[in-house]
Amino acid sequence: IHAYSGEKEIYSKTYYSIGGGFIVDEEHFGKDSVGDVSVPYPFKSATEMLGYCKQTGLSLSGMVMQNELALHSKQEIEDYFANVWQTMRACIDRGMNTEGVLPGPLRVPRRASALRRMLVTTDKFSNDPMNVVDWVNMFALAVNEENAAGGRVVTAPTNGACGIVPAVLAYYDHFIEPVTPDIYIRYFLAAGAIGALYKMNASISGAEVGCQGEVGVACSMAAAGLAELLGASPEQVCVAAEIGMEHNLGLTCDPVAGQVQVPCIERNAIASVKAINASRMAMRRTSEPRVSLDKVIETMYETGKDMNAKYRETSRGGLAIKVQCD
């Protein structure tokens, strides 16, 4: 930011976007943003997190709630998550009822609205079990089309990956049971705990580690949140999160024309379905997994650091140079 009085510069300050909607100034860039905060169950790894759950007998969301209660009142927590879910629902509603073309040189047509009309028309007469997948796709497309149009979204964990966490919760709301405050609070607490692990130990910035740090992390978070709602143990929740990331390792960030549209919008839909599958696979597993959540987080970060800069949000490689604007 530069401010001038006539030709003379009177103020200058540099800020950095570090992913997930977070911004820091130059003085604090690269430094820990959190001071000494006293919570009953401080954790920096999935191993520590699971240790507290085993020690206390609490679910993952229950353990995280105790930490939140050390920082905020119960009413503040409830109000915050109510606002998050309301914002997500409103975004889905706008996205699936808005037609037209997204702004930018690609002139990408919105798809969520047409898909919704198709589903509403055929749902009553169809016995295709895969219609559920179509609905999940529609929820995610709706959110990311709103993001691409400059609409209001929740950065969970980032703008480019904002469709996955709400799409999976909308799936639960639509196909399992109506979402109540208790349900969305548990979902967000579990998903948020997983997101915090990536933020502490890796990155959620596509510019730093590629799309695995955005869509991959969102998939991991949503898988964990859904597993929590389906009655998974803390260990199973972490297995779901691990599966969600393991199969996004190496995912590049190569937005065409620098727009968060192609491949980003469709990729959120694919990852939403993948998150649901990861949750189900984790809960039906009978053997001990060979890959832990901590190891996959570490691997993701190392993979991102090794990734060529062409594939880290620069639009200098991949689809970004193969797909031309008309």
Annotate each language-model stretch with its function.
Residues 224-326:
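Functionally critical mobile loop/hinge segments
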Residues 159, 178, 182, 206-217, ...:
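A short glycine-/small-residue-rich loop at the edge of a beta-strand within enzyme catalytic domains
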Residues 72-210, 318-326:
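Accessory "access/gating" subregions that flank catalytic or transport cores
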Residues 138, 142, 163-173, 189-197, ...:
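Contiguous, well-ordered alpha-helical segments that form the cores/surfaces of helical PPI scaffolds
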Residues 12, 168-169, 199-204, 249-257:
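Short acidic, glycine/serine/threonine-rich loops at helix termini
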Residues 38-41, 52, 72-80, 84, ...:
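Catalytic cores of large soluble enzymes that bind and process phosphate-bearing ligands
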Residues 1, 15, 81-85, 92, ...:
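Long, contiguous hydrophobic alpha-helical segments, chiefly transmembrane helices and signal peptides
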Residues 1-125:
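C-terminal regulatory domains involved in ligand/effector binding and gene-expression control
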